[in-house]
Structures are given as C-alpha cells and as structure tokens.
C-alpha cells in the first residue's frame, strides 16, 4: 500500500499515513525501517498497537489535531531512540 511505498523511499526511516474516518476519527498507520524507531510504542500512546516496526491506531479527533499529536510523539521517539 501507500505506507509501504513511503517507507521504501531512500533516507526514510519511518513513515506514517493518516486517513480520515467517519465520526471524527482518524486511522493512523505507522511503519519503521529500523528497530531503533519503535512505532508500536508511539501507537500505544493513542490506544493502538501492533509490532515495533508496523503498527496502527484509530484515534478520535480531527485529522489536523491527530496528525499534530502523533507526529510530535513520533518525533520524541526518534530523538530519544537508543
């Protein structure tokens, strides 16, 4: 899918795809190319889950707010990776 295409781009270490759903929800799909970026850890902050390198969540809120909050959490994970 789209998320795998984004992840395949040279230099990309993590990719996120946001999809607006009905009833003010957003589906988030997150993928990582490297184990040091644990996207599952980020998704769990939004009541999601999955695997360290492939995870997702359905998050209540507007696309703009969910995108802002999720990318802020992912940025924190990337900056604090081991």
What are these regions (language model features)?
Residues 1-82:
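Gly/His-enriched, cation/cofactor- and phosphate-binding structural elements
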């Amino acid at each position: 899918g789209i998320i795998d295409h984004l992840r395949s781009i040279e230099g990309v270490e993590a990719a996120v795809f946001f999809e607006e759903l009905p009833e003010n929800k957003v589906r988030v799909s997150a993928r990582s190319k490297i184990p040091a970026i644990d996207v599952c850890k980020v998704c769990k902050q939004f009541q999601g889950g999955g695997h360290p390198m492939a995870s997702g969540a359905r998050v209540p809120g507007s696309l703009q707010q969910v995108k802002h909050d999720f990318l802020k959490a992912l940025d924190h994970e990337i900056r604090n990776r081991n």
